[in-house]
UniProtKB/Swiss-Prot annotation:
Keywords: Cytoplasm, DNA-binding, NAD, Repressor, Transcription, Transcription regulation. The keyword Transcription applies. This is Redox-sensing transcriptional repressor Rex. Homodimer. InterPro entries: CoA-bd (IPR003781), NAD(P)-bd_dom_sf (IPR036291), Rex_DNA-bd_C_dom (IPR009718), Tscrpt_rep_Rex (IPR022876), WH-like_DNA-bd_sf (IPR036388), WH_DNA-bd_sf (IPR036390). Modulates transcription in response to changes in cellular NADH/NAD(+) redox state. NAD(+) binds at G92, V93, G94, N95, L96, G97.
Amino acid sequence: MNNEQPKIPQATAKRLPLYYRFLKNLHASGKQRVSSAELSEAVKVDPATIRRDFSYFGALGKKGYGYNVNYLLSFFRKTLDQDEITEVALFGVGNLGTAFLNYNFTKNNNTKIVMAFDVDQKKVGKEVGGVPVYHLDELENRLHEGIPVAILTVPAPAAQWITDRLVQKGIKGILNFTPARLNVPKHIRVHHIDLAVELQSLVYFLTVDEHFSLQ
């Protein structure tokens, strides 16, 4: 993100790409302005939260008018560094890793997986989704400073060991899909996504909703 942007809550930062994607669709349809209520309906975030999110960046809209789509799109493009491609390395070409390589963020043109690593000799030296797969032993030789982000879809026991090597190579951010909780220096940002935990959480809330609907 732009170094000049204000410090904002993590929850707000996570919603910015949602706003940006919807604004791109609005712009493509030729719409010139949008209200917080319309944004709310599209991204499933209440209008008050949207207005609060936008307030961190100053006056982005006018009361009674709403928001100028072109202006917002341009603003968030700069805020999210959409004009620059962020190269990503993926570790672990199993089922989940293969799905990532085939998808490769086709709806997000500024993010691209450019290389993958695995230890399976049947996968090493080949391409998956047009992305070359290297042996994990080649990490130090292949990974360069232009790749700031790594995705981990490896077995949990290997996650910390690979992370330590990534830190040594100057990686800045890790999207961790393993159950392992990684130990990294403070300047490294890690987002943990445990699919089992997310599913259990969803099932829990479904159970709670069903309980209250029966009362």
